[in-house]
């Protein structure tokens, strides 16, 4: 189960406590010890850390999977650091190839603009957008010349790019990989250079891209950013990464009843990761609930109810969560009543004239 490492010796107690919060649930924080060093250096300099998260507006709705990294960014905000949200209105025209088995359809500028507008509205359910620095990466990527791109491409080799699991699999399978997909990590990396990121947050599928950003910063004379990756949340199928294209998503702007119902239907085996990645429960309580859920049956059902209440409360408030739970329970009783009524119905006599050739004619 995810958890936080012990703070390094010599770190002031308040920074040690902050480090525990910021690393809790993370899949990796690299280089090792770098976040503690950055926290201490920022304290000495009297400035907040610049913590970057990039989002490409690839669809109209954000899921609980998107919220995993958004909530980590909010933790940095709550500790006094500056959240820098990069809206990929330039990279969104290309599409992130991470985790893809084939080339994405390129979006139009109008599609990207509309998706970006709805994204910002939904991001406000998690981040304090007014306190964040919101940037659009066309600001620095659109003016680049072909010569600029050539100089940038010199920092990465094709061999480096083929180390990526998704590219390697596609290459081995003979699936086409466009050159623009190879350039995508460089574009994302330039975002880090442009805003001088101290830390970048992303899912584990972004690990390669985040390290490219770190390398490009150093090539431009900047300190390389700390890379903090979060686990990918599996969807309602309990197998694949949560994604609209796989129809396994739970969306931030869904009605409370829909969120509650979907959470009650997730497979038992993903309950633990949902508790860790979608709630703000204390880690000790999460471990206790995960252990309870491992027993299955009624125990797992009770944990799901707690999970659903917590998540709906986060995005809609406690009253909406109580109403959603009541509506769910009423639906369960209604379905149970329908089954009982059918079982207790009197037998129906079928006349012999309605039976012929092994069939009943109605």
Regions found by a protein language model. Give the residues of each.
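Positively charged, low-complexity intrinsically disordered leader regions
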Residues: 2-50
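Conserved nucleotide- and phosphate/pyrophosphate-binding catalytic cores
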Residues: 216-362
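N-terminal catalytic cores of NTP/NDP-binding nucleotidyl/phosphoryl-transfer enzymes
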Residues: 32-97, 199-207, 213
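Short connector loops/turns at beta-strand edges and beta->alpha or beta->beta junctions
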Residues: 88-92, 189-192, 280
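Flexible loop/turn segments at secondary-structure boundaries
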Residues: 59-60, 92-94, 142-144, 234-237
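Well-ordered mid-protein domain cores that form the structural environment of catalytic cofactors
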Residues: 74-127
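Divalent-metal (Mg2+/Mn2+/Ca2+)-assisted nucleotide/phosphate chemistry catalytic cores
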Residues: 26, 105-229, 238
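Short, hydrophobic/aliphatic alpha-helical segments
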Residues: 46-55, 83, 184-194, 235, ...
């Amino acid at each position: 189960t995810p958890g936080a490492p012990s703070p390094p010796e010599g770190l002031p107690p308040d920074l040690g406590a902050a480090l525990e919060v910021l690393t809790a649930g993370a899949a990796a924080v690299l280089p090792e010890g770098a976040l503690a060093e950055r926290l201490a250096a920022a304290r000495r300099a009297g400035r907040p850390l610049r913590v970057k998260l990039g989002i490409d507006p690839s669809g109209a709705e954000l899921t609980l999977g998107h919220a995993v990294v958004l909530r980590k960014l909010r933790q940095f905000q709550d500790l006094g650091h500056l959240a820098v949200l990069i809206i990929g209105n330039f990279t969104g025209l290309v599409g992130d190839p991470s985790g893809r088995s084939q080339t994405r359809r390129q979006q139009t500028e109008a599609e990207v603009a509309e998706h970006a507008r709805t994204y910002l509205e939904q991001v406000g359910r998690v981040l304090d957008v007014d306190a964040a620095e919101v940037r659009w990466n066309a600001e620095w990527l659109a003016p680049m010349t072909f010569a600029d791109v050539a100089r940038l491409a010199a920092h990465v080799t094709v061999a480096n790019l083929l180390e990526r699991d998704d590219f390697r699999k596609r290459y081995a399978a003979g699936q086409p990989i466009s050159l623009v997909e190879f350039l995508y990590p460089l574009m994302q990396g330039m975002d880090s250079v442009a805003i001088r990121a101290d830390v970048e947050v992303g899912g584990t599928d972004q690990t390669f891209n985040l390290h490219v950003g770190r390398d490009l910063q150093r090539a431009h004379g900047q300190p390389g950013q700390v890379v903090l990756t979060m686990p990918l949340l599996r969807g309602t199928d309990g197998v694949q990464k949560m994604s609209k294209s796989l129809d396994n998503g739970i969306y931030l702007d869904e009605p409370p009843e829909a969120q509650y119902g979907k959470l009650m239907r997730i497979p038992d085996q993903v309950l633990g990761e949902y508790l860790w990645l979608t709630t703000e429960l204390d880690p000790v309580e999460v471990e206790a609930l995960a252990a309870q859920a491992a027993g299955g049956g009624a125990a797992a059902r009770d944990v799901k109810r707690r999970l659903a209440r917590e998540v709906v409360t986060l995005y809609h408030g406690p009253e909406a969560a109580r109403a959603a739970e009541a509506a769910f329970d009423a639906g369960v009783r209604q379905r149970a009543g329908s089954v009982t009524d059918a079982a207790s119905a009197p037998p129906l006599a079928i006349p012999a004239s309605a039976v012929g050739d092994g069939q009943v004619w109605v």
